[in-house]
């Protein structure tokens, strides 16, 4: 096998036959007589050709040459002769070593074969024993496998049962903590209650199975425990309410948590609120009575309290102090209840909504029927209102007594206005549909009724004064008093919340109907018995006084505008009266009237002037003379006529307007007379050319309109 190694091929290629090698390596060739020149040449040529034909690029040949080169042989005849032998000897030695080594390998293989035989015997023996053991333990292993399977199933069932019991069953300790009144309402109670509620919800899954016995049983047990738990919580909250101090700024978190949980039972929650409201109503009633009298209903005095009945020095202060106490108590009650019921967000509202949806009557309600959504703010307002109801009853009795015993008109209105202010305040605090607001509305109505009654009684007592105007035509005393009273009322109303409402003018109209209109009607009735212009002067004096009173208030602008209109109407009457007086006293009345219908632009009308009786020389002289007598004292006489008019500016305006109208009429008279003179002059010239004529109208009536305006200005 080893002769095929990498060194073998070059060795084989160099091994030549003895004949060939001797011939090749011999420098002279064979020396036999039989060799001829031709044969020797042929053999040598063949050898040379063979050598030359050998490719030096052949790998095996090159390796053979490389091996020869490594041996360091000299190219001598001795070495050439021994080369084959040495090579063969080396091959034989190598083969011998290989055979020796293979002998060792064969010996080792024999030992391995012996060992393998022993192993096969042991394996067969063990296999026989195993088959025998397996045959004897097969039934036992089957039973063990079944037992292991059963064990796994039982363990799975145990785990499921344990999980089921943990999730759906309350332990006895948990049931005791939930239902026994001897156990406290603490974190454990609320934890167990939450677990019971979760069990109740999850029982719906069990009820979905075909066999509902387990689900119904657990549901019944949990429901019973839940009911006992909520009853325990309900009674605990009632006990806490009895000792609860709302004035304490830090109300316990336990009671707030209990209320949030109890809200899931709306009926129990409402019963708690009713109980709480009754207790707070009694407490606040006692507190209000103590604030009024300084002692409780049982007669126990409180030295720290200043009794309102003793401190208040007038009815308005008395009512104001009672209303202020009620407002302060309502605000304090609301703030405390906000901490108690709303400080934790809308959890109570959510709980009540959940409880309502779970109630039986909710489930059987008609399809179209919807239950109102719980509003915590509205519920809080209602609770505050109920807490204050006892104090409100006492307040209402006391205020009604004050209103009924009051005999002052202004005080009655101030009381009504004060009550209206607190009505608006309570409406924002506890809502418009509350006992507080209803009581304030009733008291306000009662105060306004008393105000109207007193105002009407006052007007009735003044009926005898509504007969004749005062000699100096000034506003009567009853009007002055009424306007002072009205001014006080309007100032009170202006500071109230009502004046900033949507339509304060309409709201105040009812007050004006009682405190203003009757007195103005009385003045008008008095003026009807007077003669012009005294009637107008008296009415203007009354109207101006009323306008002065009303002008400072925006919510009576309509009344002020009506008064101003009436002043203008009476002023117009005074202007007419003064204008007629100017015409009569100046002596020009008949002349103005005669020329009134004539137009200066019409020649025919101008021609008629000379034919009028009023412009005849004698009549015209008398009119001119009377006018001259009138003008020096005209303004003084006119001012004297209006001396009772208290508004001097208005009197001057009346005289100016009357004088202006008189001057306009005089200008018309002057223009007509001048036109008549011109027309007469033209006629004379046309007839005879003689410019001399009788005395002209201007000569008979020399006054000019400019002079009149100066004298009457």
Swiss-Prot record:
Q: Does the keyword Transcription regulation apply?
A: no
**Localization, UniProt:** Golgi apparatus membrane
Region (Disordered) residue ranges read: 1-40
What membrane topology does the annotation report for this chain? Peripheral membrane protein
Pfam families with a match to the protein in the record:
COG6_C (PF20653), COG6_N (PF06419)
PANTHER family tied to this protein: COMPONENT OF OLIGOMERIC GOLGI COMPLEX 6 (PTHR21506), CONSERVED OLIGOMERIC GOLGI COMPLEX SUBUNIT 6 (PTHR21506:SF0)
- Specify the protein name: Conserved oligomeric Golgi complex subunit 6
Native organism: Neurospora crassa (strain ATCC 24698 / 74-OR23-1A / CBS 708.71 / DSM 1257 / FGSC 987)
Gene of this entry: cog-6
């Amino acid at each position: 096998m080893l002769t095929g190694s990498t060194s073998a091929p070059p060795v084989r290629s160099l091994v030549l036959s003895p004949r060939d090698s001797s011939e090749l390596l011999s420098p002279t060739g064979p020396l036999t007589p039989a060799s001829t020149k031709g044969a020797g040449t042929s053999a040598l040529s063949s050898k040379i050709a063979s050598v030359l034909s050998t490719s030096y690029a052949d790998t095996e040949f090159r390796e053979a040459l490389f091996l020869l080169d490594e041996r360091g042989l000299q190219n001598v005849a001795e070495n050439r002769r021994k080369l084959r032998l040495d090579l063969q000897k080396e091959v034989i030695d190598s083969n011998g070593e290989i055979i020796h080594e293979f002998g060792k390998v064969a010996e080792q293989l024999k030992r391995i074969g012996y060992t393998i035989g022993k192993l096969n015997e042991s394996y067969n023996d063990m296999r026989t024993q195993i088959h025998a053991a397996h045959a004897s333990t097969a039934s036992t292993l089957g039973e063990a496998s079944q037992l292991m399977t059963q064990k796994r199933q039982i363990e799975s069932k145990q785990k499921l049962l344990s999980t089921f019991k943990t999730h759906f069953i309350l332990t006895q300790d948990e049931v005791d903590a939930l239902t026994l009144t001897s156990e406290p309402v603490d974190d454990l109670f609320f934890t167990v209650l939450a677990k019971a509620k979760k069990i109740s919800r999850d029982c719906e899954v069990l009820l979905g199975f075909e066999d509902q016995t387990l689900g119904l049983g657990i549901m019944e047990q949990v429901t019973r425990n839940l009911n006992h738990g909520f009853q325990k919580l309900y009674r605990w909250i009632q006990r806490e309410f009895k000792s609860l101090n709302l004035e304490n700024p830090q109300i316990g978190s336990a009671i707030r948590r209990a209320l949030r949980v109890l809200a899931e039972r709306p009926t129990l929650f409402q019963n708690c609120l009713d109980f709480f409201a009754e207790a707070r109503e009694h407490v606040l009633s006692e507190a209000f009575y103590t604030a009024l009298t300084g002692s409780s209903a049982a007669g126990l005095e409180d030295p720290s309290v200043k009794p309102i009945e003793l401190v208040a020095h007038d009815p308005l202060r008395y009512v104001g102090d009672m209303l202020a106490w009620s407002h302060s108590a309502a605000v304090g009650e609301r703030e405390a209840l906000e901490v108690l019921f709303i400080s934790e967000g809308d959890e109570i509202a959510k709980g009540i909504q959940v409880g309502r949806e779970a109630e039986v009557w909710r489930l059987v309600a008609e399809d179209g029927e919807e239950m109102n959504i719980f509003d915590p703010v509205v519920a809080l307002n209602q609770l505050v209102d109920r807490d204050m109801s006892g104090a409100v009853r006492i307040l209402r009795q006391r205020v009604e007594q004050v209103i009924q015993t009051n005999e002052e008109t202004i005080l009655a209105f101030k009381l009504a206005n004060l009550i209206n202010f607190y009505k608006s305040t309570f409406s924002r605090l506890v809502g418009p549909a509350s006992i507080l607001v209803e009581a304030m509305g009733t008291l306000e109505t009662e105060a306004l009724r008393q105000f109207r009654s007193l105002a009407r009684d006052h007007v009735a007592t003044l009926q005898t004064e509504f007969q004749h105007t005062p000699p100096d035509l000034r506003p009567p005393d009853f009007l002055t008093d009424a306007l002072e009273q009205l001014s006080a009322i309007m100032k009170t109303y202006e500071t109230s919340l009502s004046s900033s409402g949507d339509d304060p003018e309409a709201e105040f109209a009812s007050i004006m109907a009682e405190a203003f209109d009757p007195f103005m009607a009385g003045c008008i009735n008095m003026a009807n018995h007077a003669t012009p212009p005294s009637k107008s002067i008296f009415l203007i004096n009354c109207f101006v006084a009323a306008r002065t009173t009303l002008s400072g208030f925006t919510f009576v602008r309509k009344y002020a505008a009506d008064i101003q209109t009436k002043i203008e109407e009476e002023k117009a009457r005074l202007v007419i009266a003064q204008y007629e007086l100017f015409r009569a006293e100046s002596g020009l009345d008949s002349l103005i009237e005669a020329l009134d219908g004539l137009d200066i632009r019409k020649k025919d009308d101008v021609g008629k002037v000379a034919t009028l009786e009023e412009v005849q020389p004698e009549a015209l002289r008398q009119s001119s003379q009377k006018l001259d007598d009138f003008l020096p004292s005209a303004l003084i006489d006119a001012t004297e006529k209006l001396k009772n008019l208290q508004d001097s500016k208005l009197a001057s305006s009346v005289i100016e307007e009357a004088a202006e109208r008189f001057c306009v009429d005089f200008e018309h008279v002057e223009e007509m007379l001048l036109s008549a003179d011109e027309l007469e002059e033209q006629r004379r010239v046309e007839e005879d050319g003689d410019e001399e004529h009788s005395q002209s109208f201007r000569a008979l009536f020399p006054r000019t309109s400019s002079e009149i305006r100066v004298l009457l200005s």
